[in-house]
Amino acid sequence: MLDLYVIKEGKRLRCGYTTGSCAAAAAKAAAIMLETGKVLQFVEIDTPANIPLKLEVHNPSIDPEKASCAIVKDAGDDPDNTDGIEIYAEVRKRQDGQVHIHGGTGIGRIVRKGLFGTVGQAAINPVPLQMIEKEIRAVSDKGYDVTIYAPQGEVIAKKTFNANIGIEGGISIIGTKGIVYPMSEEALIKTIYMEMDMVEQKHGLSNIILVPGNYGEKISDTLGLSEARVKISNYIGDSLLYAYNKGFQSMTLIGHIGKFSKLSIGVFNTHSKVCDGRMEAFIYYLALMGAPRQLIEEVNGAVTAEEGLHICIDAGYGEVIKKMEQGAEQKIRKYIKDENYPVKVIIYSMERGVHMG
């Protein structure tokens, strides 16, 4: 277990190490075992973050032709779907003095242009490739074939963003620092940007559809808006600016009333820890519509956005949704500093769907 911590929002969170570090450590351990014929319990590697790691070696195997072992991924306190996965390396000798690195079972393959490698190549990022070769060279200057594999990879990959960014069949071996820093919003946002890059390559720069999550995807499917679509989670502002500056000619945003009520009053990170303005949004637009004070007070007492919406509709003010959609469009244009930009916002309810006005 890595004894390294960061403080985030007043909490002490433990760091972990990347799949790239796991692959490099497994490769080094396997190379040592192949050369010495001795089983290792631990292996030490350097990381690009200049933080050394001493990692436990699992399932070691040695025979005259090859050696293999696994390192178990530890994501620390980061909510990482690959936490606990076993990353294996099998090392065989070559006669030409070169190190060739391959992806085996459970390692994804690149299926779209525009990523860090070529189509058909194993999804092992450049920094992990460098780490693997460096650690192999710390053992010997001989030639080796190194195969990285993850028996659980194909199953775990279904819980990741890989399919959306053009990687299929398994996980990616990633990490630019070798260390996992907990709760990395930067990594999530970069993934969203990569998805937008893939949309551009596949569909061009006409219209892009942005949805916060899975339900937004389902609603967009029912509206016939299933292509050129990216899930953006709560990072609406970052996503808008990236899409606009990338040159998309128009945008369509589809989201639940709970998130997009906030957007309608200019909240561009809709996570509950950042801001809650749901009832405030209802009250603002109801006031502009001239709604009676009694209705406004009733909505102010609602606990959820769905409840607030029901109150409005029952009182004959269902058009508040249309006002919120229009308001959100205006806020977006102001945010990206383009008052004439074509943007469409569609708000849905879990019970009532869309077009509630």
From Swiss-Prot:
UniProt EC number: 2.1.1.195
HAMAP family from the UniProt entry: CbiD (MF_00787)
UniProt keywords, alphabetically: Cobalamin biosynthesis, Methyltransferase, S-adenosyl-L-methionine, Transferase
Pathway annotation from the record: Cofactor biosynthesis; adenosylcobalamin biosynthesis; cob(II)yrinate a,c-diamide from sirohydrochlorin (anaerobic route): step 6/10
Pfam family, one: CbiD
Name listed for the protein in its UniProt record: Cobalt-precorrin-5B C(1)-methyltransferase
Family classification: Belongs to the CbiD family.
GO molecular function: cobalt-precorrin-5B C1-methyltransferase activity
Domain of life of the native organism: Bacteria
GO terms of biological process kind: anaerobic cobalamin biosynthetic process; methylation
SUPFAM superfamilies cross-referenced by the UniProt entry: CbiD-like (SSF111342)
EC top class named in words: transferase
Keyword Endoplasmic reticulum in record: no
InterPro entries in alphabetical order: CbiD, CbiD_sf
Catalytic function, reaction form: Co-precorrin-5B + S-adenosyl-L-methionine = Co-precorrin-6A + S-adenosyl-L-homocysteine
Coiled-coil residues: none
Claim: S-adenosyl-L-methionine is one of the keywords in the record: yes
